[in-house]
């Protein structure tokens, strides 16, 4: 998340939910992998040999010149996983293209409202908006949870999230674990919002 606009009365954060390099990588990786599986499955169904070894190294006796997969069961299995991977890659691509879950956090002191805008799938609920009057804001809170990981060696990790505490809506998260913010960045964001909104900061 990052600030895209700031003035004395308005503060706007951009929320990049799915448009991340890692998500784009996995979408492309899944697409290429599924196409590869479908190619092998089609070749198996048509009875084609899969030539993939260069002639320079094909003289070694332990390296086959080609690989043949019978369509039942290997080819059919690869076709199933290839089709499933293709649908998954299209799904990942669509949520990246439509920026599902992304949006803006708008803090408007002049309008005396806090507005959370999130993007959904195309249709009636494409734009999801939550508005909270500023007189319902109670505080900004940093809540830290301790999680233990590992089976044989137990290691503790501390995860902090900034929340907006309201009277009617309760606690609304303003950051996420996936944002990978360090302690300094968490404290800076919480302090920045506390000063801008004129509400106390608790941790």
From Swiss-Prot:
GO annotation, cellular component aspect: chloroplast thylakoid membrane; photosystem I
Keyword Transmembrane helix attributed: yes
Key words, A-Z: Chloroplast, Membrane, Photosynthesis, Plastid, Thylakoid, Transmembrane, Transmembrane helix
InterPro entries linked: PSI_Ycf4_assembly (IPR003359)
Mode of membrane association: Multi-pass membrane protein
Subcellular location(s) per record: Plastid, Chloroplast thylakoid membrane
One Gene Ontology biological process: photosynthesis
Domain of life from the UniProt record: Eukaryota
Transmembrane segments: 24-46, 76-98
Family membership: Belongs to the Ycf4 family.
Function summary: Seems to be required for the assembly of the photosystem I complex.
Protein name: Photosystem I assembly protein Ycf4
UniProt organism field: Glycine max (Soybean)
Source species taxonomy: Eukaryota, Viridiplantae, Streptophyta, Embryophyta, Tracheophyta
């Amino acid at each position: 998340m990052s600030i895209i606009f700031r003035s004395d009365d308005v503060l706007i954060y951009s929320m990049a939910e799915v448009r991340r390099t890692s998500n784009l990588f996995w979408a492309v990786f899944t697409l290429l992998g599924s196409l590869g599986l479908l190619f092998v499955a089609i070749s198996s169904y048509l009875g084609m040999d899969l030539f993939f070894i260069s002639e320079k190294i094909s003289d070694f006796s332990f390296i086959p010149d080609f690989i043949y997969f019978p369509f039942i069961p290997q080819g059919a299995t690869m076709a199933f996983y290839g089709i499933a991977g293709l649908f998954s890659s299209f799904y990942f691509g669509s949520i990246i293209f439509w920026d599902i879950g992304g949006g803006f956090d708008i803090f408007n002191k002049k309008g005396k409202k806090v507005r959370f805008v999130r993007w959904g799938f195309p249709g009636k609920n494409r734009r999801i908006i939550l508005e909270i009057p500023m007189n319902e804001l109670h505080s900004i809170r940093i809540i830290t949870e301790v999680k233990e990981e590992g089976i044989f060696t137990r290691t503790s990790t501390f995860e902090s999230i900034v929340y907006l505490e309201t009277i009617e809506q309760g606690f609304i998260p303003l950051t996420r674990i996936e944002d990978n913010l360090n302690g300094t960045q968490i404290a800076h964001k919480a302090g920045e919002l506390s000063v801008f909104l004129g509400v106390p900061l608790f941790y």
